């Protein structure tokens, strides 16, 4: 029996690849990208909203990888945790949150301490400083006796030297609250590692659980501490874990981890709650009450303050229900995004969903290896394409985002040129199977490498992102015998419906996004799409 050849749809997500016509500091425009440039000229393309309300964030809030992949995979706008928690503060339901109130009461009943741990900035990607301030107010209202703040400095989703600004907001907020103390400071490089570089996590853990201080010539207050590292060329992200006041975590204490995004909190939380924990030596701590803002991982024994939405019929689930095979591939930095987030928070793959994890380079920062593992990701993708069994292949290229975060223009340009070469190889493999290649991005970053003042810009942007549709036979999905046309004013929520449109599959009612194809053969010829009970 002759094997059936599947003509795949390959979705290549170029992480951090935004669009702007501004040339200065635009690594994407400066880079030589002959393949992508030629594809934009030769094939249908459009620009998509990837930030703000179009992806379930507050108006004007930059997009990010978690939100981007969730929106792409979901085919709908989902209210994000940043908005959900922010709204709860506005309507005061935050202060009635059972789990947060119980954490305060636990500390009081045990004559112990409450510890708040999280990223201290207004970046809105992993956390928000407003949530921290609300937690402090809640602790005040519950008459917590000892409140210790363990602040993680940002420098990626905010400017690289903004830590003092944000910590001052916190310091001013607790100035007349004698029960509250800023205890430790740590750069996110250490406290928020997600790549199993356990020595970084260990450094953060040790400072949280020990009252030993890093000795400095200057007096230890947050301003002096940060200036000490600035003078050594160390920016916010890389500030070593440092203690500035007493307040280590002890038996019977309560801890609230207030990041709402899970991926960069899992390792540090594991060190406190996972038994046995074998990644590094930990301090015996008993009777801790650990609360996380959101569900960081189903395997972690924590109390969850804000329970997740129940999300059904994401693209992966729909493909599974139609009996189609799919493949996901990325390197370590973005693996969770093409799997967990793309599937709406489902940890396990659906039947028929294969996954491939490619290790990211073992370097301190990615400007030391701008190519990252893009070539190996490409080879794994091509191998999957050649099998001719997958109807949908989802790939993430991490380069533009991870290099954009370094603020290094030259290295970011190199990384973008690497991705362009990889797209050349990918396109050749897709074309040989008469498949469809969709190139898009989850948010902007590398197109804006400098601030208006000329300083390095390491944060994401609110810019639109491109989408290019390369179909071997455009007439196959066009309703008028010519090239496919794509509409404007779309968003990331429209990508999954577009994929289902090309596959001639009916989208589920949960997918409120709409196909980007204007002249789909199914609409112009009134052809009924394949449908099953979803």
From Swiss-Prot:
What does the note accompanying the cofactor annotation read?
A: Binds 2 manganese ions per subunit.
Give the EC number(s) under which this enzyme is classified.
5.4.2.12
Required cofactor names = Mn(2+)
| Family matches, as SUPFAM superfamilies | 2,3-Bisphosphoglycerate-independent phosphoglycerate mutase, substrate-binding domain, Alkaline phosphatase-like
Q: Which GO terms describe its molecular function?
A: manganese ion binding; phosphoglycerate mutase activity
GO biological process terms, alphabetically, are:
glucose catabolic process; glycolytic process
List the catalysed reactions: (2R)-2-phosphoglycerate = (2R)-3-phosphoglycerate
Q: Which Gene3D superfamilies match?
A: Alkaline Phosphatase, subunit A (3.40.720.10), BPG-independent phosphoglycerate mutase, domain B (3.40.1450.10)
Q: What is this protein called?
A: 2,3-bisphosphoglycerate-independent phosphoglycerate mutase
Q: Active site located where?
A: 65 (phosphoserine intermediate)
Top-level EC class as recorded in UniProt: isomerase
* Database matches in PANTHER family: 2,3-BISPHOSPHOGLYCERATE-INDEPENDENT PHOSPHOGLYCERATE MUTASE (PTHR31637:SF0)
List positions binding Mn(2+) 1.
Answer: 401, 405, 460
Organism domain of life: Eukaryota
- Role description: Catalyzes the interconversion of 2-phosphoglycerate and 3-phosphoglycerate.
The region annotated as signal peptide is none
* Matching Pfam families: iPGM_N, Metalloenzyme
Q: List the NCBIfam families.
A: pgm_bpd_ind (TIGR01307)
Q: Does the keyword Chloroplast apply?
A: yes
Q: Which family does it belong to?
A: Belongs to the BPG-independent phosphoglycerate mutase family.
Cysteine pairs forming cystine bridges in this chain are none
Primary localization class, coarse: plastid
Subcellular compartments: Plastid, Chloroplast
Please name the pathway: Carbohydrate degradation; glycolysis; pyruvate from D-glyceraldehyde 3-phosphate: step 3/5
